[in-house]
Amino acid sequence: MVLGRVSRRALLVGGWSILGVPLLAACLGRGKKKDGSSGGSGSAGASGGSGQGVTRTVTTVGASLEVTVGPAVVSDDVMVVPLAVHLNKMGSGGLSSDGKKFDVHLAWSGTGNFTGADGVRLVDFDADTVQETFKASSESTGLTKEEPDTTLHALFKPVSAKTINILVPESGLFEGVPVVRDGKLSDEAKKALEDVYDTESSPDPVALETFTASVDGASDTRVTGKSVVINLASDVLFASDSADLSAQADATLNKAAEQLATYPGGEVSIVGHTDDVADDAHNLDLSKRRATSVSDRLGRLTNMSAFSVSTDGKGESSPRAPNDSDGNRQLNRRVEITLVPTQAASSTSSPDASKGTGHGSGDLPKAEGPVAKGSEGVTVKRDGRQDELTFVLTEVTRRGKYLVGEVKATGGPGGTQTGPADWLQPTQLAGSARGEEDNRLTSAVTGLSLLTPQTRYYPADYTTARGSHCPLSEITADNQLGAGDATTLTVVWPDTGQDTVTLDLQPAEHSTPSPNNPFRLTDIPVKG
């Protein structure tokens, strides 16, 4: 039996999948029940105390909702964030039962063992961190015309901040939610905390990371709180089976040198890697010689005296992807430069951004699909299907080192057969923009990048408790949209340093059963 992509709503039956095992969705972990937890001193929906919640009218999987987040209330070892929701208008998409009931608890859940608001995340742009819920309560609630109101609760480890930013699945970012200390519990909060589960996510804030790639495919860069990793494609630097730098190598190495030059000093390791085509000994020797060639050339292109530099080679022993296809072998043929800086970079702006114009030097690469201004939107049709979606992004907001955008996706006549995430995959099937294949990201929005003439900026991400990378974007946008139904897809990108940005979706590199359909949105203003 062959199964197509099915939404979590279709799969969830009492918290179990159609295959008879717990269903894991995207990044958040499998829940584990904790008998007798909470002891009645968690908190939410404070009945008294200072501060008001943050209210927005949002569009979520076709439904119009008025959502009030907060105030968050801290008591003992838990901080509870209430999400009060009022149904303004029903949709006809994947979470609307016969147009009579909207299952908001499925829109905001993040795991398959229970439903509720465990998919909600806390974002601290000043500290460059994200925090997942570490406990969850199964709160199954359907909103109807007769009963349009409910409250769900997201449970976090307490933080010291006076206000917090809450990212709600397919509903947007709620900024400045007040935090109340030692507040009293509402009756709804007490009920929610009577039966809670561990989500198996990290309870502590996790550092945000950024991932960018050169437009020509010659390099990509990952920046974490501790290091900068620049991957250089060996196919650009060297001829096959050679350690002599090509005529094209300097263009790529100069970009790497510019990145290193933004740091005052640190430790730099340069490591060569190969695919598995030749034998181990040959690959190890080749990788070491290639690392030495890159190190020597960098030393002539820029002053490396502030850095402690080492070289090594690992042959085929540390592949970036399985050596099971030509595309993956190409990813594995690389030279990896890792910098552990002594201090932060001297500038947070990108080297190819020209502030004030919204464009770096040179022209953007040719668009592969329809193009329109972000405020006007583009309509994308699926090959061989009647499905169509319209994507609009009117603006992005600058928050610290990041840009926050809320992409509106609207279903065309007849609705869609799959959720928006199926349309927005990166160039690698069932994987992340990094090229890491991960089936848990099949419902995540990972392919949308901000494009400059030289660089693609992919969604910021972070390392989960399981060691995989989770994007700071929608992670379960898998519900179908009815005709005219819209939903909100929030994405957080690294700041490009521009006043206007371009949103771009690349075509898939390989033939897939459900290929994405590329498009481009231009002239998107940056606010804040």
Segments and roles (model prediction):
Residues Q52-V74, K373-R398:
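Low-complexity, acidic Ser/Thr/Pro/Gly-rich terminal tails and inter-domain linkers that flank the onset
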Residues N88-K145, K255, Q259, G412-L481:
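The feature marks short-to-medium sequence segments in extracytoplasmic or secretory-pathway proteins
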